[in-house]
C-alpha cells in the first residue's frame, strides 16, 4: 500500500510539473503571437510617427523599388551606386535622426528624410509625393487603389508649396528671319494663361519663317504643359503617333491626364512584336500609347528645338515626338531621356500613409533602346555653347 501511495504522489507531482510546463508553453505561444499581432497591426493615426513605423515603411519602400522600379541598373552603371545594398546605412540614418526626436518624427520630418535618402537614386521622378500630387491623386478614377486610411490625415499635416511665380516669363530674341524662345521649365500656375502667352508670341512674330525653341537644361515634368502649351501651337498638321513603355509588373494607369491630352493606351503581355534590347529580360508587359493632337494654329514656320544632355522628362517628350512626327527638327546634344514613360505609379505606405511615387516602366526608343539610358538623339548634332543659335542658322540658311 505504501509503495502504491508513493507512486500516486510521484504521478501527481509529474502531472503538476507537466501542467506547469504546458501552461508556460501556452503563455509563451500566446505571448509570441500576441507580440507578433501587436507589432504587425497597421499603425493608427497620431501626430508623431514612431521610429518602428518609419523603419517598417522604409522596408516597404525598398521592396517596391526592387520589384517594380526598372532604372536600378542604370543607377548602378552610371552613378556606381547600388541603392539596395545601402539599405542598412539608410536605416541607421533613420534611427539616428529619429533618435534625436525621442524615437518619433513629424509627418514633414519623415517626408523630408525619405526624400533625402531617395536622392541617392539620382532620379528626380522617384520621391515621396508632395501635397499637390496628393490632391491630384484624389481626383483620379483609381485613387482608392492608391490611398489608404492614413493618407488623408497624414497629408493634411504637410505644408502646401507656394508657387514662386504667377506668370510665365519667356526669354525672347529676334534674328533676321528667326524667332528664338527660351523655355527654361514647364512649371506653371496657369497652363491656359501660359498657352495664350506663348501663342501670342508666335502670332506677333508670324512673319518669321523659323522658330527656335530652346529646351536646354529643361528637366520639368509636366505633360499637360508639353502638349497644350508647346506642341499644339507649333503643329503644321495633325499628328498621330505611337510609343511603347516596358514594365516588369502590370501597370495601374489613371486615364484622367491621358484622356484630356488625346492619349489612349493598351497593355499587353505579348512582347514578341515589340523591338526591345536583348538585355531587357525583366520585361513582362508592354504598354502601347497612342497620341493624337489636332493643330491649333495656322503654323507655317519651320520649327527647331534645342536640346542638351540636361534636357529630360517632359521636355524630352517633346523632343521624342518631334523626331517621330517631324513637326520640329531637334538640334544639339543627346538628352538624358525619361520623356516617353509618361505615367508614374503611386502607392501609399501602410504605416505612415505617405505616398511613394516613381516611374513604373521604361520608355522604348524607336530602335528598341531604353530612353532612360540612351536618351533622345538630335537630328542635327551641335555642341552646346553660346553660339549654337548662330551655328544652326548658318547651317540651315
Question: What name fits each language-model region?
Answer:
Residues 378, 392-393:
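Juxtamembrane/interface motifs at transmembrane-helix termini
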Residues 2, 7, 15-260, 302, ...:
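Flexible, low-complexity junctional segments that flank or bridge functional domains
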Residues 36-39, 228-387:
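Conserved acidic, small-residue-rich alpha-beta core segments centered on
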Residues 12:
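Conserved active-site segments centered on acidic
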Residues 113, 384-392:
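Short, hydrophobic-biased amphipathic alpha-helical segments
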Amino acid at each position: 500500500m505504501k509503495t502504491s501511495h508513493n507512486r500516486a504522489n510521484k504521478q501527481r507531482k509529474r502531472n503538476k510539473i507537466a501542467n506547469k510546463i504546458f501552461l508556460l508553453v501556452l503563455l509563451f505561444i500566446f505571448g509570441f503571437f500576441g507580440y507578433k499581432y501587436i507589432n504587425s497591426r497597421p499603425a493608427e493615426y497620431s501626430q508623431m510617427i514612431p521610429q518602428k513605423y518609419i523603419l517598417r515603411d522604409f522596408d516597404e519602400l525598398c521592396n517596391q523599388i526592387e520589384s517594380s522600379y526598372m532604372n536600378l541598373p542604370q543607377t548602378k552603371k552610371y552613378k556606381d551606386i547600388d541603392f539596395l545594398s545601402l539599405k542598412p546605412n539608410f536605416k541607421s540614418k533613420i534611427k539616428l535622426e529619429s533618435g534625436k526626436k525621442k524615437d518619433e518624427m513629424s509627418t514633414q520630418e519623415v517626408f523630408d528624410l525619405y526624400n533625402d535618402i531617395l536622392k541617392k537614386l539620382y532620379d528626380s521622378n522617384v520621391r515621396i509625393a508632395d501635397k499637390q500630387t496628393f490632391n491630384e491623386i484624389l481626383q483620379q478614377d483609381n485613387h482608392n487603389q492608391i490611398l489608404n486610411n492614413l493618407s488623408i490625415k497624414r497629408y493634411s499635416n504637410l505644408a502646401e508649396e507656394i508657387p514662386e511665380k504667377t506668370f510665365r516669363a519667356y526669354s525672347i530674341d529676334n534674328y533676321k528671319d528667326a524667332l528664338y524662345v527660351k523655355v527654361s521649365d514647364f512649371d506653371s500656375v496657369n497652363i491656359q494663361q501660359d498657352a495664350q502667352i506663348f501663342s501670342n508670341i508666335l502670332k506677333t512674330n508670324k512673319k518669321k519663317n523659323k522658330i527656335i525653341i530652346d529646351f536646354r537644361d529643361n528637366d520639368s515634368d509636366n505633360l499637360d504643359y508639353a502638349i497644350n502649351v508647346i506642341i499644339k501651337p507649333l503643329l503644321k498638321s495633325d499628328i498621330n503617333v505611337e510609343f511603347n513603355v516596358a514594365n516588369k509588373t502590370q501597370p495601374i494607369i489613371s486615364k484622367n491626364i491621358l484622356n484630356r491630352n488625346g492619349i489612349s493606351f493598351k497593355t499587353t503581355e505579348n512582347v514578341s512584336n515589340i523591338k526591345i534590347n536583348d538585355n531587357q529580360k525583366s520585361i513582362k508587359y508592354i504598354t502601347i500609347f497612342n497620341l493624337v493632337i489636332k493643330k491649333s494654329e495656322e503654323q507655317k514656320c519651320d520649327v527647331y528645338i534645342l536640346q542638351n544632355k540636361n534636357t529630360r522628362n517632359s521636355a524630352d517628350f517633346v523632343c521624342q515626338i518631334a523626331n517621330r512626327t517631324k513637326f520640329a527638327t531637334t538640334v544639339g546634344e543627346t538628352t538624358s531621356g525619361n520623356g516617353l514613360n509618361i505615367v508614374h505609379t503611386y502607392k501609399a505606405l501602410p504605416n505612415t500613409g505617405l505616398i511613394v511615387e516613381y516611374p513604373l516602366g521604361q520608355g522604348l526608343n524607336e530602335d528598341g533602346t531604353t530612353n532612360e539610358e540612351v536618351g533622345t538623339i538630335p537630328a542635327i548634332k551641335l555642341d552646346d555653347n553660346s553660339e549654337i543659335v548662330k551655328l544652326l542658322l548658318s547651317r540651315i540658311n
